[in-house]
Structures are given as C-alpha cells and as structure tokens.
Amino acid sequence: MTNRNAITAKLRAVLLLVVLAIMQVQPVFASDKDSITLVNANWQTLYDEDGVQLKSVNCHIFNASQNITVLTFNAREFSMQVGVSDTLIETSRMAESLNADFAINGSFFDFAGPALTFIKKHGRIHPGGASPEQTSRNNWGLVMADSNSRSVKIIPSAYVDMPEKSSACDNVLASYPLLLQGKTICLDSCDYVPNNFNNRNPRSLVAIDSSGNVAFVTIDGRAEGKAMGMTLYEECKMALWLGFTDALNLDGGGSTTLWSRTLGIVNYPSDNKKFDHEGERKVSNILYIKHL
C-alpha cells in the first residue's frame, strides 16, 4: 500500500468513527433539547387554589406536537380514592356522582363492563375486579392511598402479591406498566408489551415527586398537528423531565380524561375523533380526589 493509500484509509477510518460518534450523541442532544423545551414552554395555569395546581401546555417535543395537562396536589390536604362501576360510565359523570373535586380515568377494563385489574375501595377488595391469580405478568404497579398517614405511594408488585402489599391502605388501584421507580425507567423489565404501547397514543398516568406531591397527568393524542400522543418510553422521559420520581401508566387511548368540578373536562379526549372536550369514553374505574 502506498503512503497516499494508507493516509486515505486512515482518513476514512477516522471519518467513520466521527460519523458513528455523531449518531450516538444526536439522540442525547435531542433529548436534552426536548427537556428544555418542555420545562421552559408557555404553561397555562388553569387553576391554582387550596393546594391544587392545574396547568397545561401545547409544545413540540419528540418531533411532534404534544398537549399535556398536569394536576398536582398535596396528599396531606386531599383524599385520593378509587371510583368503580359495574357498568361503564364517563369519568366526569362518575366523578360528579362521587362529589369529587378532580378526577382522572383509571386502569384497564373490559368493554363488557368489569375492570381487568385489582381494585380496593374504602378498605374492601372490589369483587368485580380481577383476582390476583388471573395474570402472572410482571411490572404491574399499585397506586395506594393511606388515609392514616395521608400519603400516596406507587410501588411495584407482582400481581399475586397485590392483596398483601395493599393491606395497610384503604384505596388501591393496580395498573400496567410501572413507568418510573426512584427516577429509574422500569420498561426494560416488562415481560409483555402490547403493540399499541410502542405506538403514539393518548396517555394517562399518576405520578409522585420527591416531596410526596401527587399528579394526575394526561397526554392528548390522535389529533394531527395538535396532539400526537406518546409511546411509553416518551411518556417515561416526559415524567422525568417534569420532576417525578415514581409514575404508573393508566388506561389511555380514548379513555384518557382529566376532569375538574369547576372547569369540567380540561384535556382533549379523543374517542369522538375530534380535538375538543366532548370525546369522553365510558370507563369502569377512576381515580379522584376530595379536599379534606
């Protein structure tokens, strides 16, 4: 090999290494840019009273338009409870019937009516929900409200352990998958991930920050140019950027709904295929809060 050929080969090798390095760094830069965009976006405060803050934003992250609504509350000032119905009913109607202040749609359910998950309401396991033996999937999580300590926790749980782990709490809802635990993304441990979890869809989640504040979060979707929705991994990243340490995914898609007694539906439910506040889907369970 001549000196010129040797130099050319070395330059090609160096160029290849540079290209590979750029390919590896670009996602990090994009992620950093998206986090800054989200945090510094023009958030609109919809409600800020009595230990509750409700805010929303429309921004461009993950190379798509996103519409995010976040309700944050102090668990010591509000009682978080589970609402459940044996027949399907809109989140707003169930919340109104329970005299709730705020509510978000809950966990997964069968369109025939019954919940597909473990539910404990006011200290009693709901007989219409799923039994612990019905599934062996891992990476389920429990969101649990303890009225004695006035606290809310999100913990991982093998489905068969749910009654034992929830024994000290009055209101418990199981859902899937657990997104964050101690600021660590938990998706790698999933043994079953439906295809729609990897696609962009409307999402609902419950989350907790390092101070113990609790949040109900909705991510709208299925509205081209206005709200594309997120994959599960994007949902995890968003939750981290918003400062949450623990987070649990709830039922999403057309079920995604966030409701306020004073403002009504504050996100854009997609079941009517329109970008408005009228597209609620009927569900079987919700999470709601009432001022103590």
Annotate each PLM feature.
Residues 2-15:
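Bacterial N-terminal signal peptides that target proteins for export
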Residues 73-76, 144-151, 183, 208-212, ...:
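Short acidic-glycine loop/turn motifs at beta-strand connectors
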Residues 30-146, 151-153:
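Zymogen propeptides
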Residues 71, 103-108, 218-221, 250-253:
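Active-site-proximal beta-strand/loop segments in catalytic clefts of secreted hydrolases
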Residues 113-137, 191-208, 213-245, 255-292:
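Conserved, well-ordered active-site substructure
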Residues 168-193:
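Short, conserved active-site entrance elements at the starts or edges of catalytic domains
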Residues 13-24:
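Bacterial N-terminal signal peptides
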Residues 101-105, 144, 207, 215-217, ...:
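Structural recognition of the beta-strand scaffold that forms the well-ordered cores
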